Amino acid sequence: MKTVSVIIPAHNAAATIAGTLASLRSEAAVIGEVLLVDDASSDDTAAVAEEAASRLALPLRVIASNCRDAGGARNLALAQADCPWIYMIDADDLHLEGGLRSLLSRSDAQPRAEMVVGAFRRRTKGEHHQFKLPYGYTVTGIANASAYLEGQVRSIAVGSALVSRRAIGETRFPTALAYDEDTLFWARLMCRAPLAVITQPVMTYFVSAERSDDRFTIKPAQRFLAWRHALRQLTDCGIAKSTLKTREGLVALKIARVHYARGDFDTAARFLAVAKAAPKVPSDIWRCMRYQLKLAVRRRFSISHALLQSA
């Protein structure tokens, strides 16, 4: 049965979308529709996708969008999806043969599960990294969402999870956030959707470390405050405020590390102070101490260098 709606947000993805669609060809027997949200592309994304889908016999429908936001683009498709199961993948990632059918098989074997998570692999600069296996999840409940936000379980890559449309309901991705919008979406779902995992690899996703880090350097304070506001709305799911504070600290530490690496020590220090004030596990306490020491050393070196230059 064709039971899956595949959702692909795409912005200027003409160079990669045909490969993404080709990677889904082996799952054609279970795919009822592919909803490609062409989000303000200025290239031939839609035309390339339509040609590839016709050649691959995939049931593609293009949705024109001007969201300029991956979360918003996914939301448009979620509102129009017709199949009982939803699978989302980005327009530069690759599905692995048999992954979608394995996710569906686990949902059949564990009928209460409305969210099935598989393994994934990262690809950076052409290098394939070791598969990341899902671990630490319980069957259902807020415990999953809390552990996810606190970094105690494996993160879910978009493209490694299958979710029932019934479980999603009216849940949508937060929009206009520079980062972590998928984490907030998964957390909401995990609060109520019974979950199952498989160890089979489902997809490979491309990571640009530079592009990922850039998200934290543009208007860092403004973007962090917008993200924190969206994060704190998760209290309406019953998630404890202490868990949300822990997440704040994890993200603040990541931002501090990026600014430290790029030589912006003042911004790094400000975000490190936020990270230090948040509840954390011992390993993160050590990371904060280590970066505090490194900042002190680099600042002292910079002052000494400036004095020598002016002498």
Which residue ranges define each predicted feature?
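Short, well-formed alpha-helical segments that are part of the catalytic scaffolds
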Residues: 13-26
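A conserved acidic beta->alpha catalytic loop
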Residues: 23, 38-48, 67, 90, ...
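Glycine-rich, basic loop-to-helix element that forms the pyrophosphate-binding segment
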Residues: 65-81
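Catalytic core of nucleotide-sugar-dependent glycosyltransferases
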Residues: 201-209, 214-242, 265-278
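Membrane-interface aromatic/basic loop that binds lipid-linked glycans or pyrophosphate carriers
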Residues: 260-311
